[in-house]
Amino acid sequence: MLATCASIILNFQLSTFNCAQAQDIHFSMFDLDPLLFNPAYSGFFDATARFGAVYRNQWASVSTPFQTFSATAEVALSRSNVHRNGFNAGLWVSNDRAGTLAYGSTTASAIVSYFQGLGDGSNIISVGLEGGLGQVGFNTDGIEMTDGTESFRRTKVVYPTLGAGIAWYCQLSDALYTKVGASLRNINEPDISHTDMAADARLSRHFNIYGRAEWRFLSDWGLLPVVGYQRQRNFNELVYGADVRWYVDEDPRRYLAFSAGIIGRHADAAAIDLAVLWRSWTFAFCYDVNLSRLATASNTIGSFEVGVVYMIHKDNRRRRAIQCPIF
């Protein structure tokens, strides 16, 4: 009887996870490593390669906090300054764990993107495709089952996933640029159910749209507003905010800048982010406070994130006030 009850409870938990957690990972610092947001951003940088990693710890007040980690790598395969076009390749991996069952996912995707400059190159269009494999699963080591007949259809599920994206960059003047992009992931909506009780446990299509701009003022300062929206199944998230950046030294040999900003997740959380850009490195930290109905349960403790990005530059040319992301 105890085994049967345990089985029912565990099946219920898994059914809940299948429905509620059939979502992709997301970060408050969602554009620190933009490859996680849109495959078209692969190669969208003024360097030959870029590497990044982000770690998120959420709900530290509970016994088993939610943890998410991601890493990315991108490289320019070919670039033509004459035709202002080229190909880029990228790879991203992620892992997250949640709850006492350590229910989580691991995903790895390969990306290829193509960009084309328009006119004098102040406008750039990029498209990207991605394909990969994911695995979701849980750990039953902490569950005691006295009835050997109790079992689950599978504790781990491996599935393929496909995605595509498009991005546009526009340099309006020497002091102003904007970039926008949209992507669709899980186009194939793979089945990730563990039990027969899950009526609809597909990883739903994930739509993202994103915009970022920078306006340079007072020579050494920049204002960077940002907005992002994503929808997956019944889950919606609207993020908006702005950073202020101080460019201390823009010589590549001594490059140094500091930034700070506020990010809001509509009706959910507010976050403060800090970053240091030094030579080819970017170090970032973000802390958010829970403002949703879960604030009481979490003691308003939201999450913190840390991230690092490293770029390999092709030469030591002086960076322009507003950098073209590719040339």
Predicted regions and their residues:
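Short, basic, low-complexity termini and linkers enriched in Ser/Thr/Gly/Pro
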Residues: L2, I9-C19
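A generic N-terminal leader/anchor concept
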Residues: M1-A6, A22-H26
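Subset of outer-membrane beta-barrel
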Residues: Q23-F327
